[in-house]
């Protein structure tokens, strides 16, 4: 499943998200949710323990001035890869 996050982790039910995660899932961070990608983020470290792949949209990272401060465990992607992820996952959930 592709989990598409759009809001800050402080505005999202992160416990519910983590309870739903499976190792084959991907997480895509857009809009304000990209703050989740910051190094040493408590939520990020917990999510990484589920062995899911994490992606953040470069344009949203740049718009918030945090591109240079994100975790090396987060894949920075553009719109083409965003589309690839939506094609890869038939099931998607927006948070």
From Swiss-Prot:
Q: Where in the cell is it found?
A: Cytoplasm
Example of a GO cellular component annotation carried by this entry: sulfurtransferase complex
Which residue stretches, if any, does this entry annotate as coiled coil? none
Q: Does the keyword Transport apply?
A: no
One of the protein's GO biological processes? tRNA wobble position uridine thiolation
Q: Name one Pfam family in it.
A: DsrH
Query: What keywords appear on the UniProt entry?
Result: Cytoplasm, tRNA processing
Asked whether the keyword Ion transport is assigned, the reply is no
| Annotated family | Belongs to the DsrH/TusB family.
Quaternary structure, from the entry: Heterohexamer, formed by a dimer of trimers. The hexameric TusBCD complex contains 2 copies each of TusB, TusC and TusD. The TusBCD complex interacts with TusE.
Q: Which HAMAP family does the UniProt record give?
A: Thiourid_synth_B (MF_01564)
NCBIfam families, per the entry: PRK13510.1, sulf_tusB_dsrH
Summary of the function given for this chain in its UniProt record = Part of a sulfur-relay system required for 2-thiolation of 5-methylaminomethyl-2-thiouridine (mnm(5)s(2)U) at tRNA wobble positions.
Protein name (Swiss-Prot/TrEMBL): Protein TusB
State the gene name recorded for this protein: tusB
């Amino acid at each position: 499943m592709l989990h598409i996050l759009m809001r800050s982790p402080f505005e999202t039910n992160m416990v519910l998200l983590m309870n739903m995660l499976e190792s084959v899932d991907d997480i895509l961070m857009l809009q304000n949710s990209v703050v989740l990608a910051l190094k040493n983020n408590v939520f990020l470290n917990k999510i990484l323990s589920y062995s899911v792949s994490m992606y953040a949209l470069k344009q949203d990272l740049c718009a918030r001035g945090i591109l240079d401060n994100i975790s090396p465990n987060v894949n920075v992607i553009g719109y083409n890869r965003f589309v690839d992820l939506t094609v890869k996952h038939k099931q998607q959930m927006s948070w």
